[in-house]
Amino acid sequence: MKKLIKVVFSEFNETVSVELDDSQSPKTVKAILENLPIEVNINKWGQELYTDRTPIAAREENAKSEVSLMDVAFWPAGNAVCLFYGSTPISKVGKIVPASPVNIVGRIISQTNIIDKVKDTTRVVIKQE
């Protein structure tokens, strides 16, 4: 199942469109959808954006230690949603490495330079399209 959601950055008048895909982490995607809308702060770690703790409860589900550009994931260790725009401080050349394993839940499908604008504790709302 694929489902569109959006991450709204009201401060910058920008929205990031995300296509959730439950093919790798169906329980996690279901938990995300059941908890929308979520209003939370988002932070920056290298070229990764990640939320503060969310009400989403999900354990590792086919968790990955390496992700692809524009992946969206859930980080069970931090109860956080992560958007990968590029490398993190622990990435290796040509590989995007999260802080610890993440459940892949979808992809960023809109083009935006939001990564350049976000500072730690930027407020966002994650909601259905």
Label every model-predicted segment:
Residues 1-16:
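Eukaryote-biased recognition of intrinsically disordered, low-complexity regulatory segments
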Residues 18, 22-129:
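Glycine-rich active-site loops that engage anionic ligands at enzyme catalytic sites
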